[in-house]
Amino acid sequence: MTPTLARFLDQHGFARDQLSATGPDGRFTPLMRACKEGRLDIVEELLTLGADLSVLNSDGCNALWLACYHGSHAIIQRLIDAGIALDNQNGNGATALMYVASNSKPDLVKLLLENGANPALRNFDDFSALDLAASLECLKLLKKAA
């Protein structure tokens, strides 16, 4: 473990010997926090050390959702390459693709679709990413993929 990772873990209240455990509030694992903050260096080291990609936070989201929140293409692609569940549905049935479409992030819609995200999935309110698209660009990308 590098000193940089050790500082990151300490700063956010994570145990150094439980790299896949959620912190005291149950909202983030170290990997999720690093994704949310756009820390590719920390993401890389955590993956190298075996951080579990299947862990979900209290909302049912995996680290991909937090990477999409930040918007780092490099982190999103790294998680996908490492085998993260691209179509994980959270506690509301929403996927990362639905999130980026509803937040008008067409570059991320394109990235997720190119990597195999399923645009046909529906959340628990029966909406798809296409239904939730918040911009014309997102709408066009999703219609083309449908």
PLM region spans:
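Ankyrin-repeat inter-repeat connecting loop/turn
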Residues: 16-19, 53, 86, 119
